[in-house]
């Protein structure tokens, strides 16, 4: 959606060529040979028009030229010279894994090291965690990746339309890989399969879409008594619940991590192949990098939104943030070295930022349950890495549609059916139906049933 001809559902398609010198190789890397034409297709699969792509330094469309031979750029192992100086690394658990998996309906209950939670799987979100508990205590009612947006940097027509919602437009579940032992997952693995519906409503088997395994997490804690020289040290083992999806050229490795200290993390790793477009040889542009002769990989952002429906010892939770500030010089602070921390309650729904200069950290609290040592409310702290918010301006359709992409944190009051940060229907959406719009209701979220959306991302 870009505000032009949006009343009719159409597809802007980009074309690539399989290497003519190796045309029998079905897995040839066609992203190394983008073509300078782009058909626009109607919903009944008719070609409406063919756009000619700009391949120079500006938006000018040059004259089409006959195809000239280009070098291949293959990724398959049989086309690579492999290293021979690496010794085997084996992950062996002679007594098997320490977790248990129990089937319950279409879901699986996993138990490991005081953790207990249910894993579900659906077409849009892929893996979903329910009823996450630690040592019998409730932590989270539901956790899932809500959506992601990938806006591209090239401002020229038709590349300005490249801003996919990989979950809303496609689906993390339906695009999940059939995971294999050895590279996708290591160790003593338990695989979880699923059955989804295809585009005609028929059952569609999805084998091995989730792998569950343990891994070493490095040193968990250590202290050496320098007086005696004696060290106490423990390793940190982690439970990993992982899925991998393929969305056209990109792969995403998505994993929930649980450790023995009660910490819970969500990780996304981007891999696969960059989305490419043609460029005249010898040309450079500021919105991309030439990665192969005549091939441009455009800069782009990946902005993810993790939906956290908390239940920290119950559903009456609040969101607060702590900051550290220097004390002014005074009789109490004559040397100017003191500083304090203060806590602020987030009272209404809205979008909020992490201020790293003030060491601002957000926490989800339950003031009805107190720490037995210091009397403070029990809480889970949110550790989110810094990332650059969406660079499309506020009047652009990219910004209007990706309602989660402008803030590190969104907090809203829970309402049934509000699951997707970019809105329920993202294909050619206009905005106004996602988490920014829900937050604008300015509802009270103190000691209430709230939902927190945590954003993170990369720009490359």
Where are the predicted features?
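Extended effector regions of multi-domain proteins
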Residues: 1-4, 18-263, 269, 273-460
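Long, charge-dense tracts
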Residues: 2-14
């Amino acid at each position: 959606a870009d505000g032009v001809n949006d009343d009719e559902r159409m597809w802007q398609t980009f074309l690539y060529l399989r290497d003519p010198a190796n045309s029998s190789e079905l897995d040839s890397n066609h992203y190394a040979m983008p073509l300078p034409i782009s058909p626009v297709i109607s919903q009944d699969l008719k070609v409406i028009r063919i756009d000619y792509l700009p391949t120079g330094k500006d938006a000018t469309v040059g004259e089409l030229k006959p195809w000239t031979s280009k070098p291949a750029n293959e990724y398959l192992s049989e086309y690579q010279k492999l290293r021979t100086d690496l010794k085997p690394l084996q992950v062996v658990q002679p007594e098997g894994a320490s977790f248990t998996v129990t089937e319950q309906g279409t879901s699986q209950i996993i138990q490991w090291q005081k953790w207990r939670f249910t894993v579900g799987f659906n077409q849009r979100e892929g893996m979903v965690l329910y009823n996450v508990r630690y040592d019998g205590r409730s932590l989270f009612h539901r956790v899932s990746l809500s959506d992601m947006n990938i806006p591209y940097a090239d401002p020229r027509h038709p590349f300005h339309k490249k801003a996919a919602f990989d979950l809303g437009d496609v689906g993390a579940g339906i695009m999940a890989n059939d995971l294999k032992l050895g590279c996708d997952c290591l160790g003593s693995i338990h695989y979880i399969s699923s059955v989804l519906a295809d585009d005609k409503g028929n059952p569609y088997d999805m084998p091995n879409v989730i792998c569950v395994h343990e891994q070493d997490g490095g040193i968990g804690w250590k202290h050496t008594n320098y007086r005696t020289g004696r060290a106490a040290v423990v390793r940190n083992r982690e439970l990993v619940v992982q899925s991998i999806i393929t969305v056209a050229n990109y792969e995403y490795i998505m994993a929930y991590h649980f450790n023995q200290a009660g910490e819970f993390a969500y990780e996304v790793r981007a891999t696969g192949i960059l989305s490419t477009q043609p460029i005249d040889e010898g040309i450079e542009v500021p919105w991309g990098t030439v990665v192969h002769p005549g091939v441009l990989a455009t800069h782009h952002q990946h902005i993810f939104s993790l939906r956290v429906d908390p239940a920290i010892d119950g559903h009456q939770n609040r969101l607060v943030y702590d900051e550290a500030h220097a004390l002014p010089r005074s009789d109490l602070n004559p040397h100017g070295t003191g500083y304090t921390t203060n806590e602020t309650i987030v009272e209404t729904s809205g979008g909020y930022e992490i201020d790293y200069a003030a060491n601002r950290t957000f926490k989800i609290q339950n003031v009805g349950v107190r720490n037995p040592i210091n009397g403070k409310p029990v809480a889970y702290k949110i550790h989110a890495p810094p990332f650059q918010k969406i660079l499309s301006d506020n009047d652009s359709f990219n910004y209007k549609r990706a309602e989660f992409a402008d803030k590190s944190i969104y907090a809203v009051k829970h309402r049934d059916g509000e699951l997707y940060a970019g809105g329920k229907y993202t294909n050619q959406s206009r905005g106004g139906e996602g988490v920014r719009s829900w937050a604008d209701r300015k509802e009270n979220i103190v000691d209430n049933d709230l939902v927190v959306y945590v954003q993170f991302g990369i720009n490359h």
